[in-house]
Every structure is written in structure tokens, then in C-alpha cells.
């Protein structure tokens, strides 16, 4: 069964606590998440310890729970 996910997700900067919406570029559940935030691409890898996607860009660390599941289809 296939799953459909949202095209946007929330991403939080760990250093300053700011939360932004980012456009999902590529996503594979529990593997990786690639997003565009204000035309800047950020790659996040899945972290099994806290079940989140974590990545770094320009000296800042970002965290996301990933895009929301919209539904299942065959």
C-alpha cells in the first residue's frame, strides 16, 4: 500500500527555536528528508533515537518530524 505525504513540513532551528514551513523536495520515510527553505536546500537524515530528521546548514542545526501523512492508496 502506498502512502501520500504533504508537500510542506515544519522545520525548526535548534539554535534559535524559530519554526518555518519548508517545501519538501525528496522524502523517504525513516531514511531522509530534503527540503527547500527560502530557496536554500537542506538535507536531513533520520535519527532513530528521537524519531526526527536532523540536518545542518550554514552553521545552524535543523530538526523536523517530516511531512504529514495525507492518506493511503493502492
Model-derived features: where do they sit?
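Cysteine-centric segments in proteins
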Residues: 1-74
Amino acid at each position: 500500500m502506498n502512502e501520500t505525504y504533504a508537500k510542506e513540513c515544519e522545520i525548526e532551528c535548534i539554535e534559535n527555536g524559530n519554526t518555518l514551513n519548508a517545501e519538501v523536495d525528496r522524502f523517504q520515510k525513516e531514511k531522509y528528508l530534503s527540503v527547500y527553505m527560502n530557496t536554500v536546500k537542506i538535507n536531513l537524515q533520520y535519527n532513530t533515537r528521537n524519531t526526527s530528521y536532523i540536518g545542518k546548514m550554514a552553521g545552524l542545526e535543523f530538526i523536523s518530524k517530516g511531512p504529514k501523512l495525507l492518506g493511503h492508496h493502492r
